[in-house]
Amino acid sequence: MRKGDILTHSFRPFPNNPSTAGGEVRKAVIDARERGIVFDIGHGMGSFAFKTAKVMLANGFLPDCISSDVHALCIDGPAFDLLTTMSKFLCLGMKLTDVVRAATETPARALRRENLSSLRPGSVGEASILALEQGTFDYVDSTGEHLAGGQRLTAAGVVINGSWWNG
């Protein structure tokens, strides 16, 4: 892989996960990041594990991009949607600003579409308005492991072409 290439399903369970049994990030993964490889979550049916994510985050290896790989087999779980995937990372300890950046600005930059992640004059002017809810929420990963979380992101509105959309 070359600088700027995107590796999706990067926090997957065994086999081929990015961490060792000893709780470290594999050297090849660290080397890939140093070469400029972009690490994307792509949470779908079989491609995301809390165990892997906990090891990666504990080692300071945050995902560059948080995305979902939602299709017919996982729309009813475990991935559900992008906001659920983002919420899982909040509950794993990532800061809200880092989670939002990894789902917006960084993917847009990786795709060379920076105008999609900006609200500056002259940009596309589209945004999802999110709410952060407190409560008790049950999250599940691709292996069936559960994580109790105290927060979740929900959709509160949409701005399209600079105007509030009323659907």
Each PLM stretch: what is its role?
Residues 1, 31-33, 120-121, 148-152:
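Solvent-exposed alpha-helices and their adjacent loops that cap or buttress functional pockets
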Residues 1-76:
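Active-site core of metal-dependent hydrolases
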Residues 51-132:
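His/Asp/Glu-enriched, well-ordered alpha-helical/loop segment
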Residues 124-167:
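C-terminal cap of metal-dependent C-N hydrolases
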